[in-house]
Amino acid sequence: MEQFEFVNKTEIPTHAINNTAFAHLGVNLAYKTDDTSRYLAAALMTDGNHLVGSGFEILAASCDSLNTALYGYKAVAFINKETKTIHIASAGTKADINDIWDDALITFHYAPNKLKIAQKFVDNIISKIGGIDEAREYTFDTSGHSLGAIIADLTGIELHSRNLNFNKSVTFDSPGSQEVIKYAINQDLFTGKVITPIEELAKHSEVYNAKPNIINTTNQHVGQINLVLPKINNEKSKSSEAVGWFKYLYNISGSAVYKVAEYLNFNKMFEGINNHKLKYFADLQDSAVIPIANWEEQILENNAYTQKLKTIPSTGNDVYLLDTNRITDNEYTSIIGIDVFHWAYNDLQQSCAMETVEQIGNLIPILC
């Protein structure tokens, strides 16, 4: 009979997964929960390839229970019993009528139907770990992509409404959750009464967006917004792939169709849809991650990191940095001047490709 050698838990090598990488990992698995057999296979792969040694294990999935496999809700919860941490990851839109209906609701600033199911999922999590008293010993994080980003933010506030320890929501290419959160609070849609100002709630939200597209400009954002630009080094970018697609369109359809596509700016639209995919955010260490102060105007945060961008030559005006300087300051007058720096996205992408990503601790790349 074949002999098996058992390994003690203490012999398993440990490894840490940074917050954004774990958030991406969780959301990627959450997308599989609409198909139980596909989810179970993916869960085994995730556990074996990523979770062993991390301290995390899968606690629950939306497909585990009939009361959470509703309205297209797709989520996975992870638990680390040693650090007393629970992470809830939510997937975004798939080709499902429930998702499309929720997309319409958030566009008009209503709460998605999935909020009700997210609340039931939180109920299930609390039950699994032994009840509300046990849950209060844990710190909760959430993550999500696209529509799931709004679900992640709402789930975080739901946890907060129950007086649980909510730490942070990490989201990818969010449509913007500010108006939806305000609506849900005003309509008392959360389990507990939420009296915390939205400005305070926003401190628990971290957003990673691709260049502005039709999705991530839907609503106003809350929290720290970061612009994610993959590094390029005079190589083919996503936009050049789009150009290639339109050359193909020209070859099969003729110049008239090609000119219409150019006129309607389908090139930019194609790039935006491509950049919206979850895989765009798979490895932020291979991207420039730049903090944004104003998403609508693409104005960068003015801090020690963005000050370094001043040395980069400019070829466009996609993003701006406003730098104030005191021109006159005496007992009679005080005049403040503003210098405006601007760059094309490609300026930052190409420059960052030549730099080593600077990190704070072992968390996230803040700037190239």
Curated annotation (Swiss-Prot):
Gene3D superfamilies noted in UniProt: alpha/beta hydrolase
SUPFAM superfamilies hit by this protein: alpha/beta-Hydrolases
Domain of life: Bacteria
Xref: InterPro entries: AB_hydrolase_fold
Descriptive protein name: Uncharacterized protein RP165
